[in-house]
A protein has these predicted regions:
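Acidic (Asp/Glu-rich) sequence patches and key acidic residues
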Residues: 1-106
Length: 106
């Protein structure tokens, strides 16, 4: 099987944490430890997929806040959208094959 990888851009962790109350299933994503390898079972992958979609929804609903987000986190909406889309794509592949997700920390 092809390897699917998503890189979390610098500043994304702060953005996601600060918007966590407006995102669906942030608590599942928060389980990923940025400093060590973390595994999520296959039954948790749909929750991460929903989380990725909630990021896209947040962007669509807060289009006027892009300058603030760029200033505060150094992230354009395009970069955030790319991350969310790639995360969703990895989730789709994992769900299609019944796999969980692995995260490799720094």
């Amino acid at each position: 099987m092809k390897h699917y990888v998503v890189d979390e851009p610098e500043g994304m962790d702060g953005f996601l944490y600060d918007t966590r109350n407006e995102l669906t299933n942030y608590t599942y994503y928060y389980q990923f430890d940025p400093y060590r390898e973390t595994q999520l079972e296959a039954d948790q992958v749909p929750a991460i997929k929903t989380f990725s979609r909630s990021i896209v929804k947040w962007l669509e609903e807060h289009g006027t806040e892009e300058n603030r987000v760029i200033q505060q986190y150094g992230l354009s909406f395009q970069k955030i959208r790319h991350f969310a889309d790639e995360l969703g794509h990895v989730c789709d592949a994992a769900m299609e094959h019944g796999y969980g997700l692995s995260v490799l920390g720094d």
